[in-house]
A protein has these predicted regions:
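Short catalytic micro-motifs in class I SAM-dependent methyltransferases
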Residues: 157-162, 187
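Conserved N-terminal segment of class I S-adenosyl-L-methionine
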Residues: 1-157, 167-172, 207, 237-240, ...
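A short glycine-rich, Lys/Arg-flanked "PGG" loop and its adjoining helix->strand segment in the class I
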Residues: 167-183
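Conserved beta-strand edge residues that scaffold enzyme active sites
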Residues: 122-123, 143, 191-192, 227-229
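Short, glycine-/aromatic-enriched active-site segment of Class I SAM-dependent methyltransferases
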Residues: 184-215
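Extended hydrophobic-aromatic, low-complexity segments
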Residues: 166, 195-197, 232-234, 252
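Conserved S-adenosyl-L-methionine
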Residues: 11-18, 219-229
Length: 293
Protein backbone atom coordinates (compact mmCIF):
# COMPACT_ATOMS: atom_id res chain seq x y z
CA UNK A 1 0.00 0.00 0.00
CA UNK A 2 1.73 3.13 -1.26
CA UNK A 3 1.08 6.68 -0.14
CA UNK A 4 -0.52 8.65 -2.98
CA UNK A 5 1.54 11.73 -2.11
CA UNK A 6 5.11 10.51 -1.56
CA UNK A 7 4.99 6.84 -2.57
CA UNK A 8 6.20 5.53 0.78
CA UNK A 9 4.92 2.15 1.97
CA UNK A 10 5.56 3.01 5.64
CA UNK A 11 2.37 3.86 7.50
CA UNK A 12 0.55 3.49 10.80
CA UNK A 13 -3.12 3.26 11.73
CA UNK A 14 -4.49 6.78 12.23
CA UNK A 15 -8.11 5.95 13.06
CA UNK A 16 -10.66 3.12 12.91
CA UNK A 17 -14.29 4.11 12.38
CA UNK A 18 -17.54 2.92 10.83
CA UNK A 19 -19.37 4.67 7.99
CA UNK A 20 -22.80 3.57 6.74
CA UNK A 21 -22.23 0.16 8.25
CA UNK A 22 -18.81 -0.29 6.65
CA UNK A 23 -15.69 -0.56 8.83
CA UNK A 24 -13.05 1.98 7.76
CA UNK A 25 -9.38 2.20 8.59
CA UNK A 26 -7.47 5.42 7.95
CA UNK A 27 -3.71 5.22 7.75
CA UNK A 28 -1.10 7.94 8.09
CA UNK A 29 2.02 7.93 5.97
CA UNK A 30 5.06 7.92 8.25
CA UNK A 31 7.06 9.83 5.63
CA UNK A 32 4.85 12.77 4.60
CA UNK A 33 1.90 12.64 7.04
CA UNK A 34 -0.93 12.13 4.51
CA UNK A 35 -4.05 10.45 5.95
CA UNK A 36 -5.79 8.00 3.63
CA UNK A 37 -7.75 4.77 3.21
CA UNK A 38 -6.23 1.70 1.60
CA UNK A 39 -7.38 1.53 -2.02
CA UNK A 40 -7.28 -2.26 -1.79
CA UNK A 41 -9.67 -2.23 1.17
CA UNK A 42 -12.06 0.59 0.23
CA UNK A 43 -15.20 -0.05 -1.81
CA UNK A 44 -15.26 3.63 -2.71
CA UNK A 45 -12.11 3.21 -4.82
CA UNK A 46 -14.22 1.45 -7.48
CA UNK A 47 -15.46 3.97 -10.14
CA UNK A 48 -18.77 2.09 -10.36
CA UNK A 49 -19.43 3.08 -6.75
CA UNK A 50 -20.35 6.64 -7.82
CA UNK A 51 -22.49 5.67 -10.78
CA UNK A 52 -24.61 3.10 -8.95
CA UNK A 53 -24.18 3.22 -5.17
CA UNK A 54 -22.91 6.53 -3.76
CA UNK A 55 -26.15 8.55 -3.63
CA UNK A 56 -28.24 5.58 -2.50
CA UNK A 57 -25.99 4.99 0.51
CA UNK A 58 -25.77 8.65 1.47
CA UNK A 59 -29.41 9.68 0.98
CA UNK A 60 -31.49 6.55 0.19
CA UNK A 61 -32.15 7.65 -3.40
CA UNK A 62 -30.32 9.01 -6.44
CA UNK A 63 -32.03 12.37 -6.95
CA UNK A 64 -30.96 15.82 -5.69
CA UNK A 65 -32.22 16.65 -2.21
CA UNK A 66 -33.38 19.95 -0.75
CA UNK A 67 -30.22 19.94 1.37
CA UNK A 68 -28.03 19.55 -1.74
CA UNK A 69 -29.72 22.40 -3.54
CA UNK A 70 -29.63 24.70 -0.51
CA UNK A 71 -25.97 24.08 0.36
CA UNK A 72 -24.81 24.36 -3.25
CA UNK A 73 -26.84 27.52 -3.73
CA UNK A 74 -25.26 29.13 -0.66
CA UNK A 75 -21.74 27.90 -1.48
CA UNK A 76 -21.65 29.07 -5.09
CA UNK A 77 -21.56 32.88 -4.52
CA UNK A 78 -18.67 32.50 -2.06
CA UNK A 79 -16.61 30.50 -4.57
CA UNK A 80 -17.40 32.84 -7.45
CA UNK A 81 -16.41 35.88 -5.37
CA UNK A 82 -13.17 34.22 -4.25
CA UNK A 83 -12.09 33.21 -7.76
CA UNK A 84 -13.01 36.60 -9.25
CA UNK A 85 -10.18 38.24 -7.31
CA UNK A 86 -7.61 36.24 -9.27
CA UNK A 87 -8.90 36.51 -12.85
CA UNK A 88 -6.85 38.77 -15.11
CA UNK A 89 -9.92 38.89 -17.37
CA UNK A 90 -13.42 37.36 -17.18
CA UNK A 91 -13.18 33.60 -17.83
CA UNK A 92 -14.58 32.60 -21.20
CA UNK A 93 -14.72 28.84 -20.53
CA UNK A 94 -15.24 27.09 -17.19
CA UNK A 95 -15.17 23.38 -16.37
CA UNK A 96 -16.55 22.01 -13.09
CA UNK A 97 -15.47 18.47 -12.21
CA UNK A 98 -18.02 16.87 -9.90
CA UNK A 99 -20.60 19.44 -10.98
CA UNK A 100 -23.53 17.79 -9.16
CA UNK A 101 -26.69 19.79 -9.93
CA UNK A 102 -24.80 22.45 -11.91
CA UNK A 103 -25.60 25.29 -9.49
CA UNK A 104 -21.98 26.48 -9.32
CA UNK A 105 -21.69 26.49 -13.11
CA UNK A 106 -25.00 28.32 -13.37
CA UNK A 107 -23.70 30.99 -10.99
CA UNK A 108 -20.45 31.36 -12.94
CA UNK A 109 -22.42 31.62 -16.17
CA UNK A 110 -24.67 34.36 -14.82
CA UNK A 111 -21.72 36.28 -13.34
CA UNK A 112 -19.27 36.13 -16.25
CA UNK A 113 -21.41 35.07 -19.22
CA UNK A 114 -18.99 32.15 -19.59
CA UNK A 115 -19.32 28.95 -21.57
CA UNK A 116 -19.69 26.26 -18.91
CA UNK A 117 -19.23 22.48 -18.96
CA UNK A 118 -19.71 19.98 -16.14
CA UNK A 119 -18.54 16.48 -15.23
CA UNK A 120 -20.92 14.44 -13.06
CA UNK A 121 -20.97 10.62 -12.82
CA UNK A 122 -24.35 10.48 -11.03
CA UNK A 123 -27.04 10.04 -13.67
CA UNK A 124 -29.86 11.82 -11.81
CA UNK A 125 -27.68 14.79 -10.83
CA UNK A 126 -26.28 15.09 -14.34
CA UNK A 127 -29.80 15.02 -15.79
CA UNK A 128 -30.88 17.76 -13.35
CA UNK A 129 -28.11 20.04 -14.62
CA UNK A 130 -28.82 19.18 -18.25
CA UNK A 131 -32.46 20.21 -17.81
CA UNK A 132 -31.14 23.69 -17.00
CA UNK A 133 -29.26 23.76 -20.29
CA UNK A 134 -25.79 22.98 -18.92
CA UNK A 135 -23.58 20.81 -21.08
CA UNK A 136 -22.66 17.75 -19.00
CA UNK A 137 -20.53 14.61 -19.33
CA UNK A 138 -20.21 11.51 -17.11
CA UNK A 139 -16.39 11.49 -17.08
CA UNK A 140 -13.40 13.56 -18.12
CA UNK A 141 -12.60 10.88 -20.68
CA UNK A 142 -16.00 11.43 -22.33
CA UNK A 143 -15.32 15.16 -22.47
CA UNK A 144 -11.84 14.61 -23.88
CA UNK A 145 -13.33 12.66 -26.78
CA UNK A 146 -15.18 15.84 -27.75
CA UNK A 147 -11.90 17.80 -28.00
CA UNK A 148 -13.27 20.72 -25.97
CA UNK A 149 -10.10 22.82 -25.95
CA UNK A 150 -8.79 24.48 -22.81
CA UNK A 151 -10.60 26.19 -19.96
CA UNK A 152 -9.82 29.41 -18.07
CA UNK A 153 -11.02 27.87 -14.80
CA UNK A 154 -11.36 24.26 -13.70
CA UNK A 155 -13.09 23.70 -10.37
CA UNK A 156 -13.27 20.53 -8.30
CA UNK A 157 -15.39 21.18 -5.22
CA UNK A 158 -15.44 18.31 -2.72
CA UNK A 159 -14.03 15.99 -5.35
CA UNK A 160 -10.36 15.14 -4.87
CA UNK A 161 -10.92 13.55 -1.45
CA UNK A 162 -12.92 10.93 -3.37
CA UNK A 163 -10.26 10.15 -5.98
CA UNK A 164 -7.98 7.09 -5.79
CA UNK A 165 -5.04 9.11 -7.17
CA UNK A 166 -5.66 12.85 -6.70
CA UNK A 167 -2.23 13.89 -7.97
CA UNK A 168 -2.59 11.98 -11.24
CA UNK A 169 -6.11 13.36 -11.73
CA UNK A 170 -5.04 16.96 -11.11
CA UNK A 171 -2.04 16.53 -13.37
CA UNK A 172 -4.31 15.22 -16.12
CA UNK A 173 -6.56 18.24 -15.70
CA UNK A 174 -3.56 20.59 -15.93
CA UNK A 175 -2.15 18.90 -19.02
CA UNK A 176 -5.38 18.36 -20.96
CA UNK A 177 -8.00 20.89 -19.89
CA UNK A 178 -6.49 23.98 -18.25
CA UNK A 179 -5.15 26.90 -20.28
CA UNK A 180 -1.60 28.06 -19.60
CA UNK A 181 -2.79 31.07 -17.59
CA UNK A 182 -5.89 29.34 -16.24
CA UNK A 183 -6.86 28.77 -12.61
CA UNK A 184 -7.62 25.62 -10.67
CA UNK A 185 -10.01 25.82 -7.71
CA UNK A 186 -10.39 22.91 -5.30
CA UNK A 187 -12.28 22.56 -2.04
CA UNK A 188 -12.02 19.72 0.48
CA UNK A 189 -13.08 19.02 4.07
CA UNK A 190 -10.55 20.19 6.66
CA UNK A 191 -9.31 17.20 8.69
CA UNK A 192 -8.61 19.45 11.67
CA UNK A 193 -12.27 20.45 12.15
CA UNK A 194 -14.53 18.44 9.83
CA UNK A 195 -15.73 14.93 10.70
CA UNK A 196 -14.01 13.84 7.45
CA UNK A 197 -14.20 10.10 8.05
CA UNK A 198 -16.62 8.76 5.45
CA UNK A 199 -16.77 5.71 3.23
CA UNK A 200 -16.29 7.85 0.12
CA UNK A 201 -13.43 9.97 1.49
CA UNK A 202 -10.32 8.12 0.37
CA UNK A 203 -8.03 10.95 1.52
CA UNK A 204 -8.39 13.36 4.45
CA UNK A 205 -6.58 16.63 3.79
CA UNK A 206 -4.92 19.10 6.11
CA UNK A 207 -3.94 22.56 4.83
CA UNK A 208 -0.37 21.26 4.52
CA UNK A 209 -1.10 18.07 2.59
CA UNK A 210 -3.53 19.83 0.25
CA UNK A 211 -0.80 22.25 -0.77
CA UNK A 212 1.71 19.41 -1.17
CA UNK A 213 -0.68 17.51 -3.46
CA UNK A 214 -1.17 20.62 -5.59
CA UNK A 215 2.60 21.12 -5.78
CA UNK A 216 3.20 17.54 -6.90
CA UNK A 217 0.48 17.87 -9.54
CA UNK A 218 2.36 20.81 -11.07
CA UNK A 219 0.46 23.73 -9.55
CA UNK A 220 1.55 26.85 -7.69
CA UNK A 221 -0.70 27.95 -4.84
CA UNK A 222 -2.24 31.42 -5.08
CA UNK A 223 -4.40 31.35 -1.95
CA UNK A 224 -5.69 28.88 0.62
CA UNK A 225 -8.82 29.80 2.53
CA UNK A 226 -9.96 28.10 5.73
CA UNK A 227 -13.66 28.77 6.22
CA UNK A 228 -17.05 27.38 7.19
CA UNK A 229 -19.20 28.70 4.32
CA UNK A 230 -22.04 27.92 4.02
CA UNK A 231 -22.48 25.80 7.18
CA UNK A 232 -20.67 27.62 9.99
CA UNK A 233 -19.59 31.09 11.09
CA UNK A 234 -17.17 29.76 13.71
CA UNK A 235 -15.61 26.55 12.40
CA UNK A 236 -13.16 26.26 9.50
CA UNK A 237 -14.77 23.12 8.12
CA UNK A 238 -13.42 23.53 4.60
CA UNK A 239 -10.23 24.31 2.71
CA UNK A 240 -10.51 26.16 -0.60
CA UNK A 241 -7.40 26.56 -2.73
CA UNK A 242 -6.78 28.54 -5.90
CA UNK A 243 -3.71 27.63 -7.91
CA UNK A 244 -2.13 28.17 -11.31
CA UNK A 245 0.11 25.89 -13.39
CA UNK A 246 3.76 25.99 -12.39
CA UNK A 247 6.05 27.64 -14.92
CA UNK A 248 8.11 24.43 -15.14
CA UNK A 249 6.03 21.43 -13.96
CA UNK A 250 8.94 19.07 -14.67
CA UNK A 251 10.82 20.56 -11.68
CA UNK A 252 8.63 19.65 -8.74
CA UNK A 253 9.46 20.90 -5.24
CA UNK A 254 10.49 18.38 -2.60
CA UNK A 255 7.72 17.10 -0.35
CA UNK A 256 7.66 18.56 3.15
CA UNK A 257 6.35 16.33 5.93
CA UNK A 258 3.20 17.24 7.87
CA UNK A 259 3.80 17.12 11.62
CA UNK A 260 1.58 16.62 14.70
CA UNK A 261 -1.48 15.87 12.57
CA UNK A 262 -3.31 13.82 15.20
CA UNK A 263 -2.67 16.42 17.90
CA UNK A 264 -3.92 19.24 15.66
CA UNK A 265 -7.06 17.25 14.87
CA UNK A 266 -7.70 16.64 18.55
CA UNK A 267 -7.31 20.35 19.33
CA UNK A 268 -9.54 21.30 16.39
CA UNK A 269 -12.29 18.90 17.44
CA UNK A 270 -12.07 20.17 21.02
CA UNK A 271 -12.61 23.72 19.75
CA UNK A 272 -15.51 22.43 17.67
CA UNK A 273 -17.20 20.88 20.71
CA UNK A 274 -16.88 24.12 22.70
CA UNK A 275 -18.16 26.22 19.78
CA UNK A 276 -21.17 23.95 19.34
CA UNK A 277 -21.98 24.09 23.05
CA UNK A 278 -21.46 27.81 23.63
CA UNK A 279 -22.66 29.27 20.31
CA UNK A 280 -24.83 26.60 18.65
CA UNK A 281 -26.55 28.94 16.19
CA UNK A 282 -23.24 30.30 14.89
CA UNK A 283 -21.37 27.01 14.99
CA UNK A 284 -23.95 25.41 12.69
CA UNK A 285 -26.13 27.44 10.35
CA UNK A 286 -29.42 25.54 10.01
CA UNK A 287 -30.53 23.82 6.84
CA UNK A 288 -34.16 24.17 5.65
CA UNK A 289 -36.41 22.49 8.22
CA UNK A 290 -33.51 21.85 10.60
CA UNK A 291 -33.45 23.03 14.21
CA UNK A 292 -30.16 23.72 15.98
CA UNK A 293 -30.31 22.76 19.65
Amino acid sequence: MKCQLCGSESHNVFSKVESFGFPLVYYQCEQCGLVYQSLEESQAADPEFYAATYRKIYQDHEHPTAKDLYVQGKRAPYLVQLSNKYFAHPPEKILDVGASTGILLETFQKTFNSEVVGIEPGDAYRAYAERKGIRMFPTLEDLMNEQPGHFDLVSAIHVIEHLPDPIASLRMIRENFLSGDGLLMVEVPNLYVHDCYELAHLTCFTPHTLVEVLNQAGFQLLTLRRHGSPRSRLMNLYLTALAKPQSDPSRLPSIRSDRFVLLKRQVGLLYRRFAQKLFPHKAWLPLPGEKIR
